[in-house]
Amino acid sequence: MITMSRIRSLAAFAVFVILGVAAVLPAQAEVRIDITRGQMKPLPIAIPDFAGASAQDNRMGADIARVVSADLERSGLFKPIDPKAFIQNAASLQAGPRFPDWKAINAEALVSGKIESGADGRVRVEFRLWDVFNEAYMTGWTLSASPQDWRRLSHKVADAIYKRVTGEDGYFDTQIVYIAESGPKNDRKKRLSIMDQDGENHRFLTDGSELVLTPRFSPSAREITYLSYFKGVPRVYIFNLDTGRRESLGNFPGMTFAPRFSPDGNKVVFSMAENGNTEIYEMNLLTRQKRQLTMNPAIDTAPSYSPDGQQIVFESDRGGGQQIYTMSADGSNPQRISFGDGRYGTPVWSPRGDLIAFTKQKGGQFFIGVMRTDGSGERLLAEGFLVEGPTWAPNGRVLSFFRESPSDERGRGQVVRLYTIDLTGVNERVLLTPVDGSDPAWSPLIP
């Protein structure tokens, strides 16, 4: 589990140093994945155990290779080769790859690595990425951290490989906050929970004594805003992951819900229901001043900022049905952008700024989809009896959401699980949690 002190200690990570390799072969058409071209064949990659000087280092080296391999495999872009097929062992690999051995097992990329425990108690990890076809070095880094943070080291290695091969930022050194659900349908316990993006290092942040919903990360990944029914009163709160303390966004006259941070982290946009009307408001966290952004006799909710903070996308029934609208960040110039059949809700702007994810309900089914920011190019990626809560990975190439299966008249058989899916709509994966899970929110890359 990642403790607060360990999270802070990661600020002392050694600066990533590109390994000096003098004998680099001349540049050729190297291994590359163009993830903008849709569905493609995964890249065969060999990831042997990272070699160590001691038995303890060797065990950690094997664990690091396992996590790197799992990260890359889940992306759907890489196909790690079974280690049983390896001809060259990890120890001899440190002297350099025997490329014919790796070509013989059809590897197109190769990762070599080593790990060393230092006198200061920290571990030092080196890795190199090789283009097997061209017999060329591609990149390499050196990283160090405390031994208990070996999983973060692994995720950072996977991020570096992903970026070098695809040209896009990775998303493995991240966390997901979500609502852990347990108990019968008529007495559901919901707890605010957090874990690494692969489901590891899981912990509960609240005890389930009060209902919690819709958690969202701050841009720093150190705070979470969410809705809590504390003492039966629905209010928006901000939870600090470093201190474990929480504070109310404000003591407002109506029910507040659906909060989300601005890209600079200085504001929270949210909905407030008062006197039978639901409007969108913005709270400046520095001045504690609140301003109303929508003024319409309709339900305006689920606001989400554009990455530059200049626009907000939201859902509204002002046109007679649940649809998606955009407006300027000051509330001006509202425009409807969804015009397909069905009802649209829970819009979320991509971190890249190019797409908006949403939930759609049509013909008794729910869908997770994406559209361009003007509403064009709608694509449906996932469907089910109930699928909701899309949230973007920080690179804007993967989504997480939750899917609920139907229950019988006694509430039996209901299962609520988290999933991830990429923009091709093909690579859908279950994200395992200790109990049922809903309302996921993906963090930015962890500082």
Swiss-Prot record:
Cellular compartment(s): Periplasm
UniProt record, GO biological process: cell division; protein import
Cell division as UniProt keyword: yes
The protein's assembly and partners: The Tol-Pal system is composed of five core proteins: the inner membrane proteins TolA, TolQ and TolR, the periplasmic protein TolB and the outer membrane protein Pal. They form a network linking the inner and outer membranes and the peptidoglycan layer.
Signal peptide (from-to): 1-29
Source organism of the structure: Paramagnetospirillum magneticum (strain ATCC 700264 / AMB-1) (Magnetospirillum magneticum)
SUPFAM superfamilies, per database record: TolB, N-terminal domain, Tricorn protease N-terminal domain
Domain of life: Bacteria
Record keywords: Cell cycle, Cell division, Periplasm, Signal
Main subcellular localisation: periplasm
NCBIfam families: propeller_TolB (TIGR02800)
GO cellular component terms attached to this protein's record: periplasmic space
InterPro entries: 6-blade_b-propeller_TolB-like, PD40, Tol-Pal_TolB, TolB_N
Official protein name in the record: Tol-Pal system protein TolB
